[in-house]
């Protein structure tokens, strides 16, 4: 799932709010009084979907620059936000390694990961370290149903997205029979499965399920 620059600004703002809990004022302060807040970002900046990860990271960097230019303060201290970026290559093993690296760097919060497959295993590492994590695009319902208080998402999960679309197809578009095509990716299949459930629950009938890919 793609993630625009504007949404990146929103995610960073929400992440900062979750980390610092308060921010106000724009007065200059001596360097000694500046508090550095480290924000981690993890996404695939190598591999097949590197373009999405790079877009996300660039958006986060822009947001950090805007926040620093605003001269925010927490209490009586000026704050400076610092972005620490890691590549997970959309691979769960590399994702957990990146997560541990950010924990070791003592980040205050993390934006990431992009894929549910990397976000979910990494979330345990952040949770155990007491570091809040917000994913801009992980849609697997399991992510926010693990009982971790510090995990957040910026998008609807597969159940809400696919299920609502299925209900809409039957109740609003008046579709009685529906055929479903998905691309067999974890994301595509997850949404399609929930779409089927939504159609059936609304009284419609799924008459076929086909698959495709990017070839």
Predicted regions and their residues:
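Extracytoplasmic "Venus flytrap"
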Residues: 37-61, 86-92, 114-117, 181-189
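Aromatic/hydrophobic pocket-lining residues that form π-stacking "cages" and hydrophobic walls in ligand
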Residues: 60, 122, 195
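Beta-alpha junction/loop-to-helix N-cap segments that form part of ligand/metal-binding clefts
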Residues: 26-31, 51-55, 73-145, 212-215
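Bacterial N-terminal signal peptides that target proteins for export
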Residues: 1-12
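C-terminal motif of bacterial Sec signal peptides marking the signal peptidase cleavage site
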Residues: 19-23
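Residues that mark the start of a beta-strand
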Residues: 36-38, 82, 176-177
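Extracellular/periplasmic Venus flytrap/periplasmic-binding protein
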Residues: 97, 140-142, 149-215
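Signal peptide-proximal N-terminal region
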Residues: 58-82, 200-205
């Amino acid at each position: 799932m793609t993630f625009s620059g504007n949404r990146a600004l929103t995610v960073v703002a929400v992440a900062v709010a979750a980390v610092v809990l308060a921010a106000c004022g724009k007065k200059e302060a001596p360097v000694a009084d500046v508090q550095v807040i480290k924000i981690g970002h993890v996404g695939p900046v190598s591999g097949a979907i590197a373009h999405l990860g790079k877009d996300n990271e660039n958006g986060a960097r822009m947001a950090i620059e805007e926040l620093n230019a605003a001269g925010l303060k927490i209490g009586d201290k000026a704050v400076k936000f610092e972005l620490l970026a890691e590549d997970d290559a959309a691979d769960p093993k590399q994702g957990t390694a990146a997560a541990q690296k950010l924990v070791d760097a003592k980040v205050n919060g993390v934006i990431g990961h992009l894929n549910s497959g990397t976000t979910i295993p990494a979330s345990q590492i952040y949770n155990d370290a007491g570091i809040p994590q917000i994913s801009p695009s992980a849609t697997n319902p399991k992510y926010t149903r693990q009982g971790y208080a510090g995990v957040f998402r910026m998008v609807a999960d597969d159940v809400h997205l696919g299920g609502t679309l299925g209900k809409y197809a039957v109740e609003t578009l008046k579709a009685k029979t529906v055929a479903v095509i998905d691309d067999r990716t974890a994301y595509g299949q997850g949404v399609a499965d929930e779409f089927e459930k939504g159609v059936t629950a609304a009284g419609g009938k799924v008459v076929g399920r086909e698959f495709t890919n990017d070839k």
